[in-house]
Amino acid sequence: MKRIFGPALAILLLFVLPLAAQQTGKLVVKADPGRTGVFVDGKYLGPAANFRVARTYNVAAGDHELKLEEPRYEEVVKKITVTANKKTVVAEKLKALPPPKGPFGRLRTESTDKFAAVYVNNKFYGHTDEFSNSSQGLLLPPGEYEVRIEPTSGSPVTQKVKLEADRTVVVK
């Protein structure tokens, strides 16, 4: 019985594993602006591009809701279909919102995951690499905010901050 079970299991795995691998496709989002956040079925995948090169994400085959979000632009939500073992390319130019008026405080973020999502009061604002050094930062009106940094793997960091005009706060 044991001699039959081992080879039967090996044969089964040879057929099942390739079928499981075929259940994903590739998603490429060519968004303008490239720093636009890509969400599939509510889950943040990362920015649309890195240094103007579109990123590719593995996505389960089937119908999905795609949301493109960038705080200075109108968000785009659309239905997409990802086909197993195929590349789905979506191109979108987001419409700019009117620029906000100051004064502003500056929010900086630090994380070991440069593509960790940054949320302010539960709204997506970008990824940590956009706000991570002394010449970068997210400009927000003075006030109190809840900042959440959500890495692609691992636990999110949530911190309440108070921004003052012309001051910088760093969330790690």
Residue positions per predicted region:
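Generic low-polarity alpha-helical segments
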Residues: 1-2, 16, 20
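Bacterial N-terminal signal peptides
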Residues: 8-18
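Short loop/turn and low-complexity linker motifs enriched in small/turn-promoting residues
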Residues: 21-172
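Bacterial N-terminal signal peptides that target proteins for export
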Residues: 1-9
